[in-house]
Curated annotation (Swiss-Prot):
It comes from Escherichia coli O139:H28 (strain E24377A / ETEC). This is Zorya protein ZorD. Transmembrane segments: none annotated. CDD domains: SF2_C_SNF (cd18793). The gene is zorD. Pfam families: Helicase_C, SNF2-rel_dom. Keywords: Antiviral defense, ATP-binding, Helicase, Hydrolase, Nucleotide-binding. SMART domains: DEXDc, HELICc. InterPro entries: Helicase_ATP-bd, Helicase_C-like, P-loop_NTPase, SNF2-like_sf, SNF2/RAD54-like_C, SNF2_N, SNF2_RAD54_helicase_repair, ZorD-like_t1.
């Protein structure tokens, strides 16, 4: 189906298939391709693609051939990034078939058997006979491919037969029929009467349905376990039995019988739930369960219950944790008349605040006493009147403030006043009065913004301009209808569906790809936002400020801003050949100075240096210095995504002598040695919901402990009780969601100094920044609701950014934020030079003809759409097509005249030839278009005799893989002299550093200038010794303004605006391109 679609788009199906027919052999295990294809000049495109598939682990390399297994083939057919390449192998069309299943015996019988009795065509449902090799069947001398669902069904039936020969018995029959039934339902197969009424369910995951009630001011929560295809009467059997069984038989209506098989890991979680009387928890148990079910339900819960499922269950049950504050209401005599308790729900969706009024001190006293019980027990949460209170961030000072408020009110009622509360002489010599806090401002800071546009990973070219007419990304009704029509078509074997937005016919596979990308776009757009609420301003002690002039000097208590001007203390363990750059020395000194002022003057900081400036080395230098200077102090904790933890350990070994720096990896297999088995945890702790604990002394002699965010969440009772000197959260975007369990666990950890480390502190909204500072310096930015009203709304206002409010926020966080860009540290780096001459490439004649015909087609569609009030539709597909035409017209039309008249390709080959014969420098070519990648690879091979490596997001990252991403890059960098590597602009993530290349060619442009600069930074970073030359080849025309010319202008104007870390990245509007489309 995809082959027909793509051949239609290119218009060259017969020509392609003529050269490629019979280039594979059908085997039982898959399709095989001879390695000799590489030597056939007529088949270079196929050979190049097969090499790509081998690099991405689709193909198995054998001694004389490549093997594409059937499972890999089906994955490939669903991979939209390879969709345009499928005609290269000419896979047969899928033959829609419906299987009819028959059985013999019952599940309890030793001779129980299930087989496919008949195949019938769809939609005619006529019986059909055929021969088959693997997933390829032959009918009437024509080859077809089984659908993925029918192939899975066929394998499941064969697997049951094989298992019965090895381990016969009822359990084998049950598990085998469960697997077959699941595949049969997906394939819309037909069952005989016995199979229709016999269900087998083996749940591998659970969801929890929660119901909350308040009984005598105490929250009571009922827990109901649920799994997919759960029989209606299963929960009754679960509750009725005294223990959890390995299997259940649940009778149903009309003679149906369901077999439920419980795997060990699911049984362990169900045992925990079953041990709860009536499946109800109350009081402290309810708090522990709601806040973190993983510590309550045991070590297997994390693999059985998905975090998002639990968070959704809490939301559905309207169960929220609440930040709280006490607000005194003063009368005309400045005395307390009453106190209001304000509860702010922590939720990704804004919820109304809840308030309680205390009219007398005794009422407030009850609240403080109940709060004190939770605080004394060091519990991360408490409760009041059935509402859950978040205490992970509740400080000792806040506790004292609550007590002081009660004491003041009691004394006022008794007619007593503090005699010295307003006496300034009672305070330090820097205090000059009492009043509202005055925010610090800095006049040299400037406003900037960044913009983003269409997502690069959505390919709109699968549909024509007419097909996309009427499509609106925000129309979720159309999205739901599209998914429903896809499901219906799959069930009955239809090959096409009707588009909900204009009734055009869509190939099913292309529609599924489009739906998947549309869903990704919605998920990105719908990330959770913070709540917004008021917060009453409070009085503070005014102090002398040293911003505009030095108003107060006292050497033993310097301003936090002075920390930037200190000299670093370089750790003795730093290896002799390692020399810190100037900006790294400044960063280490800044961290050291802030730490020395903690905890009295600061609780933590945000290290937000630009990518490639060595944040890891700075933090490691800081940590090693601390270990050397304070050897008796508690250890330090580094929390990072699991993919980065090995890099932390590797860089520690590379840069430092680590003999005196013991490190513990608290994740993966190593955690088992220091973790209590569940049965060893005392019953009184388990009764309170504490079922995950580390053994006493688990940290050993370690001075640095590495762990994951997930371990931090699951082991919070141990990690939060351990005093830490320094806690580092790397890639701190992981704690940007205030409502996530991981964020709560991070905030619960007691550390003298916390460091949030991220190059992108604001990704989607300023709430990201609030959450980071809620970790590093709680209360600095106020309550989340206050922050939303005071900063997020005016700064992110669509009608215009409030620059005064933006600068106020910048000044507020400046003392605890360090952000340097490469421009600011250029003295320590080679130059980055943009080559302007390549921006004057002339659009070729045939290229211009193809360009104008595409625009004319779109303009004609616009004229037809205006009467339907749909003007502007289809623009996304057109813009993508214009991007392809400008880059290399042969990607749109492979006729020789288009390949021979490609100005950008001709320019590329010319500049590469100059570099090869002069400087012999290495070159990176960036483009995310896979078809274009192969065209460039082939052209370079034809010109220079070697095939440059291509690396995309799917290239393996496993270190043991022969074609791993890092190994390919290392090989490229190790080869002497001239070389070329082709990278995807949007796939250059962690670990892709190519400092040996110093020429960066953006053959196609990214819609986002920040991503484009990040791609360039793969070469322009610490370790680069040569000037880096950056090329943006652009085709122009004397009569029309081209797409590339307009895009280059937009990106250039936005590049400088994209550097402010406080600015989120809104999307560009398609209106920016309307002028060139209407004028072409």
């Amino acid at each position: 189906m995809l082959k027909r679609l793509l051949s239609k788009l290119t218009g060259n199906r017969q020509q392609i298939e003529h050269h490629l027919k019979n280039q594979y052999q059908v085997e039982e295990n898959g399709l095989s391709f001879p390695l000799s294809l590489v030597d056939d000049s007529q088949l270079w495109a196929l050979a190049s693609w097969l090499e790509q598939l081998a690099e991405e682990d689709y193909l198995i390399s054998l001694t004389d051939r490549w093997l594409l297994s059937w499972d890999a083939l089906y994955r490939l057919l669903e991979d939209e990034e390879h969709a345009s390449s499928l005609p290269l192998i000419g896979v047969p069309d899928v033959l829609p078939l419906r299987a009819s299943l028959s059985s013999r015996g019952a599940l309890s019988d030793s001779d129980f058997r299930v087989w496919i009795a008949e195949w019938a065509t769809l939609p005619a449902r006529k019986p059909i006979r055929f021969s088959r090799t693997g997933a390829i069947l032959t009918h009437e001398n024509q080859q077809y491919l089984l659908s993925r669902e029918n192939w899975a069904l066929l394998q499941a039936t064969e697997q049951l037969s094989a298992q019965k020969n090895q381990t016969p018995g009822e359990t084998t029959n049950q598990l085998g029929w469960a697997a077959i039934r699941k595949c049969a339902k997906q394939a819309a197969a037909k069952f005989d009467d016995y199979l229709e009424k016999t269900h087998v369910v083996k749940p591998t995951s659970l969801s929890l349905r929660l119901r909350k009630a308040t009984v005598a001011d105490t929250a009571v929560i009922e827990i109901e376990p649920h799994f997919e295809d759960q029989p209606a009467n299963w929960l009754g059997s679960f509750d009725k039995n005294s223990q959890v069984h390995d299997s259940y038989r649940i009778p149903g209506e009309n003679g149906e019988l369901s077999h439920v098989i419980i795997p060990p890991e699911v049984k362990e979680v169900l045992n925990s739930i079953h041990s709860i009387p009536s499946r109800r928890v109350a009081g402290s148990e309810a708090l522990s369960f709601v806040r973190n079910p993983y510590t309550f339900l045991g070590e297997d819960a994390a693999s059985v219950i998905a975090p998002e499922e639990h968070e959704q269950a809490l939301f559905d049950a309207r169960i929220f944790f609440h930040h709280f504050r006490l607000i005194p209401q003063l009368n005309a005599e400045n005395k307390i008349a009453e106190v209001t308790l304000v509860l702010e729900p922590v939720s990704p969706v804004p919820q109304p605040e809840i308030t309680f009024g205390f009219s007398a001190p005794r009422e407030l006293d009850k609240f403080i006493q109940q709060l004190g019980i939770s605080v004394a027990a060091q519990m991360p949460a408490g409760s009041w009147q059935g509402y859950e209170l978040e205490l992970s961030q509740f400080t000792e000072q806040q506790w004292h403030d609550c007590q002081a408020l009660l004491t003041r009110w009691q004394q006022e009622i008794e007619g007593k006043e503090f005699s010295d509360v307003l006496d300034i002489a009672k305070y330090g010599d820097r205090v000059i009065g009492i009043g509202e806090f005055e925010k610090i401002s800095s006049p040299w800071l400037t406003k900037a913004q960044s913009e983003n546009w269409l997502p690069d990973d959505i390919d709109f070219s699968a549909f024509s301009v007419e097909t996309l007419s009427g499509w609106q990304p925000e129309n979720l009704h159309h999205f739901d209808e599209l998914q429903e029509r896809i499901t219906q078509a799959e069930a009955v074997g239809e090959t096409h569906i009707t588009a909900p937005w204009n009734d055009s016919q869509l190939p099913l596979d292309a529609a599924k790809t489009f739906s998947k990308n549309w869903e990704k776009q919605q998920s990105t757009a719908n990330e959770s936002q913070g709540n917004v609420a008021d917060k009453t301003a409070r009085a503070v002690l005014k102090i002398e400020q040293n911003i505009e002039e030095t108003a107060y000097i006292k050497q033993r208590r310097n301003s936090l801003l002075n920390a930037r001007h200190a000299e670093p203390e370089i750790p003795l363990s730093l290896k002799e050949h390692i020399r810190l750059k100037d900006h790294q020395r400044e960063g280490v000194a800044w961290l050291q100075q802030l730490f020395l002022r903690s905890p009295e003057e600061t609780a933590g900081c945000l290290l937000a240096d630009d990518m490639g400036l060595g944040k890891t080395l700075q933090i490691l230098s800081f940590l090693v210095w601390f270990i050397e200077k304070f050897p008796q102090e508690p250890p330090s904790l580094i929390v990072a995504p699991v993919s980065l933890l090995d890099n932390w350990e590797r860089e520690l070994d590379n840069f430092f002598y680590t003999a005196g720096i013991p490190v513990l990896k608290l994740y993966g297999e190593t955690i088992k040695a220091v973790k209590y088995p569940k049965q060893a945890i005392p019953a009184h702790l388990q009764s309170q919901g504490i079922k995950n604990l580390l053994k006493p002394g688990w940290q050993g002699e370690a001075k640095i402990i590495l762990t994951t965010y997930e371990t931090l969440r699951d082991q919070e009772f141990s990690l939060a009780r351990q005093p830490w000197s320094i806690m580092v959260c790397d890639e701190a975007q992981k704690i940007k969601n205030p409502a996530a369990l991981i964020t709560h666990a991070a905030n619960a950890v007691q550390a003298r100094f916390k460091v949030a480390c991220t190059g992108t502190p604001v990704e989607n909204t300023l709430v990201d920044l609030w959450s980071l500072f809620d970790f590093a310096q709680p209360g600095l930015l106020g309550a989340l609701n206050e922050f939303g009203k005071h900063y997020v709304r005016p700064i992110e206002n669509e009608d215009g950014r409030d620059t005064e409010r933006l600068e106020s926020l910048r000044a507020l966080i400046e003392p605890q934020t360090l952000r340097r860009t490469k421009e600011e540290v250029a003295r320590d780096l080679p130059q980055k030079i943009e080559v302007e001459s390549c921006k004057q490439l002339t659009l070729s004649g045939v290229q211009k003809q193809l360009y104008l015909s595409s625009v004319a087609n779109w303009q004609q569609q616009q004229a037809l759409s205006e009467g339907m009030q749909q003007a502007g539709t289809g623009m996304l597909g057109l813009l993508h097509r214009l991007k392809l035409i400008c880059a290399h017209p042969a990607v749109v039309n492979p006729e020789p005249r288009f390949r021979d008249n490609s100005p950008k390709l001709n320019w590329l080959l010319k500049i590469l030839a100059e570099l090869k014969h002069t400087t012999k420098d290495k070159v990176i070519i960036f483009t995310e278009l896979r078809d274009l990648q192969r065209e460039l690879q082939h052209a370079i091979h034809q010109k220079f005799g070697f095939r440059p490596v291509i690396i995309n997001g799917d290239t393996s990252t496993k270190s043991q893989s022969q074609n791993s991403r890092q190994r390919l890059i290392d090989d490229f960098q190790a080869q002497p002299g001239f070389g070329v590597i082709i990278l995807s602009t949007v796939a250059v993530g962690f670990g892709v550093n190519v400092q040996k290349a110093n020429h960066v060619i953006h053959f196609t442009r990214c819609w986002n200038p920040a991503k484009e600069d990040q791609a360039t930074d793969r070469a322009y970073r610490i370790g680069q010794t040569k000037d880096v030359y950056v090329y943006y080849p652009t085709v122009k025309d004397t009569e029309i303004t081209t797409f590339e010319e307009t895009l280059d202008d937009l990106l250039q104007r936005r590049r400088a605006l994209a550097r402010d870390m406080l600015c989120a990245t809104p999307d560009l509007s398609g209106a920016d391109f309307e002028a060139i489309l209407k004028g072409a």
